[in-house]
Amino acid sequence: MHKLRTLSLPPYRGREFFLTVFVAPDPTTVASFSMPADADQWGLSVHFQPGDHFESHVEVARIDTSHGEPHFDRLYESPERKDWLGDDYTFEAARRDLLANWRTYAEQYFVNYTDDAP
């Protein structure tokens, strides 16, 4: 998939967080691209920049359609879990869920994977 746009989220635990929208086909190949109408596949990812800015971003949670139907990759859980959401699950529902709950998912990531848990 191809990155469509990235939204800066408020800082959390001293880190910069983002919500990125991914789509297929490549949105740069058309004059205008409208979500979700023009997307054959879509995905949203909550991620943060680690303390070392030379490191790649770290994904915390992702909802996408890359395996044929919408699913939630709960990357913050140990072990990571994939929840199938059903064919009627929409891009808008995914956007609302991640924007409403990203801090909860981030906190669980820190508890499970880092030394700076509360």
Residue ranges of each PLM-predicted region?
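Negatively charged, low-complexity tracts enriched in Asp/Glu with abundant Ser/Thr
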Residues: 1-52
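Generic local-structure boundary detector
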Residues: 18, 23, 28-32, 53-55, ...
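A short, structured beta-strand/loop element
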Residues: 38-82
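Mixed-charge, Lys/Arg-enriched low-complexity segments
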Residues: 64-118
